UniProtKB/Swiss-Prot annotation:
Sites of Cysteine amide modification: C37
Tissue: Expressed by the venom duct.
GO terms under cellular component: extracellular region; host cell postsynaptic membrane
Protein name (Swiss-Prot/TrEMBL): Alpha-conotoxin-like Qc1.6
Propeptide: 1-21
Pfam families, alphabetized: Toxin_8
InterPro entries assigned to the protein according to its UniProt record, in alphabetical order: Conotoxin_a-typ (IPR009958), Conotoxin_a-typ_CS (IPR018072)
Ser-Xaa-Pro motif, crucial for potent interaction with nAChR, as annotated region: 25-27
Family recorded in the similarity comment: Belongs to the conotoxin A superfamily.
Localisation: Secreted
Described function: Alpha-conotoxins act on postsynaptic membranes, they bind to the nicotinic acetylcholine receptors (nAChR) and thus inhibit them.
UniProt keyword annotation of Chloroplast present: no
Length: 38
């Protein structure tokens, strides 16, 4: 397992999580993305 890939992947999921959080706190975006915002 390549540690550098793991770090890059962690970084990407971190960014995704931030983007999802930002989207889900925006009613319009949350409404358009009910599958990720619950």
């Amino acid at each position: 397992f390549d540690g550098r890939n793991a770090a890059a992947s962690d970084k990407a999921s971190e960014l995704m999580a931030l983007a999802v959080r930002g989207c889900c706190s925006n009613p319009t975006c949350a409404g358009n993305n009910g599958n990720i915002c619950g």
